[in-house]
């Protein structure tokens, strides 16, 4: 098959995968003078942040909210653009409601006073402890997000320097342990500790550094992009094309090519070879090392080492539309979390035992409350997400056999909050861990790549600059700083600090630098 002309290789950068991390990487590389080509096996950019439309119902397939809009504004500014001119964000308040089987509920808002009132309503004796929790969260936000999360952690010395702060902040405690230290009510302990599930982590084992999410929500609020996260992905693609970048959709990369220890391009599944001066992989880090670099000897990220990591849970997601339901179930807002009778036991079944439990907790997304474009007039669009085991088990769940019975169980839970919903369901689509494995090439169908435990965070994660191959960079959920929209956008920011400017940009800068020196 033909290769790109060598004369054009040096200034070309290839980005494997058009998830939000890959798109952010492409934007930042374009700002550094690279001519970027983004390659993805899907038909539209966005990866998990893309959408599918059926019968007028648009289903946002992955992330549903934006918690740190400033990270996107900074990204656009780097490219000489205005994010708010390209994407409309709408604040959501309340952020979500947490419900328990006993009928009690906890409404999460941005206002500290409103939150303290909610805590007092549930458990008056826990208000003082909640205030301490907020202070703890703020400290970890400034260190864990604004500092650690925005710089590279690829050198061991980077880790050694921060160990005293980790110790001072008791990063050895889990998120749940820290919540339990501050409040006594088990419902509040759950409400203050479940956030790691949003990025694939077990609240009973993930480091307490992740309580910073409470401060993130308080600092920036929770926002919804009109048009869904897919609208953000589409806007990112337009910026890339405006920089002179291009896309190869419906195109799968089979291998990263390495010559004398340096990444020089990729071979596509079709056999075509694309050469480049720089390669960025937004594919899952496990897929990058085990599959795309399968023919290259690796020192650290061997197949055995990748397989030995703890992986995030899988996801069962049911996307569906309902007919004539606008205005029904007014107490079910944009986001609702419906808890199972068990918390710790269910989490252990998912993360430690690899067992598909009969009970379930659901994250219910009803974007039609906020965005009329997601459904036909008078209708609603939903998705219901249930955390489930990934496929890296001795006896993985056979989703071909159990997906439909499990969906029926999800419907039974939904009926408790929205009576009669089953009679009004229209278009329907189900994603299981097998879908994540096949559609997104996610190892073992994990929803969020490598789980963010303390010994799988920062330096311990696959680095943004590859340890195995020169000229290869990694972005996305499996790298530093981690999963979630702020995490993958941040991974591209870290990558850009490590990647060089394009050769042509350096050449163009030389005369100006000489004049300045004179």
Swiss-Prot record:
PROSITE patterns: PHYTOENE_DH. Keywords: Carotenoid biosynthesis, FAD, Flavoprotein, Oxidoreductase. The keyword Oxidoreductase applies. Pathway: Carotenoid biosynthesis. Its EC number is 1.3.99.28. Gene3D superfamilies: FAD/NAD(P)-binding domain. GO terms for biological process: carotenoid biosynthetic process. Signal peptide: none annotated. The keyword Oxidoreductase applies. It comes from the Bacteria. FAD binds at residues 14-47. One of its GO terms (molecular function) is oxidoreductase activity, acting on the CH-CH group of donors. Its cofactor is FAD. It is an enzyme of class 1 (oxidoreductase). It catalyses: 15-cis-phytoene + 3 A = all-trans-neurosporene + 3 AH2. Converts phytoene into all-trans-neurosporene as the major product, via the intermediary of phytofluene and zeta-carotene, by the introduction of three double bonds. Belongs to the carotenoid/retinoid oxidoreductase family. This is Phytoene desaturase (neurosporene-forming). It comes from Cereibacter sphaeroides (strain ATCC 17023 / DSM 158 / JCM 6121 / CCUG 31486 / LMG 2827 / NBRC 12203 / NCIMB 8253 / ATH 2.4.1.).
